[in-house]
Amino acid sequence: LGDTFRWKGENVSTTEVENILLMHPHIAEAVVYGVEINNTNGRAGMAAITPAESLATLDFGELLRWAKEQMPAYAVPLFLRVKVKMETTGTFKYQKVRLRDEAFDPRKAGDDPIYAWLPGSDTYVQVTEDVLADIHGGKFRY
């Protein structure tokens, strides 16, 4: 059935979230995995996505509203990593472990922009080093 992770006391199926994200007209590929946030229990959802057209076509507020309508709040990815092309292994599997290890740190993501759904916000915002420091420093309550 695929990988799962726990967030907010719930089991989240990465395959289910991936399949839902792939129904969005502006998402061509999606890989979902759990990442750790300091001072929280479990793993928060993160999705590496490839836009169907370009990054400019993604409306992050609309994407978040849509995701919240399609799945329970605990399953909605808190972080997005936007990739031009998804890397695969020699057997055409997505490199989920590497993505999980790089998490939502923009310094580890190369040219891939990373976005976060911050508590109280109604859209995803780009993760800068300042936003990353605020997340790790506990400014936001997840």
Identify the meaning behind each predicted range:
Residues 105-108, 132, 139:
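Flexible coil/turn and secondary-structure edge motifs
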Residues 71-93, 113-137:
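AMP-binding/adenylate-forming catalytic domain of the ANL superfamily
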Residues 102-115:
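A short, polar/charged loop-to-alpha-helix boundary motif
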Residues 1-75, 90-94, 98:
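AMP-binding/adenylate-forming catalytic core of the ANL superfamily
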Residues 81, 100-101:
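Nucleotide phosphate-binding site architecture
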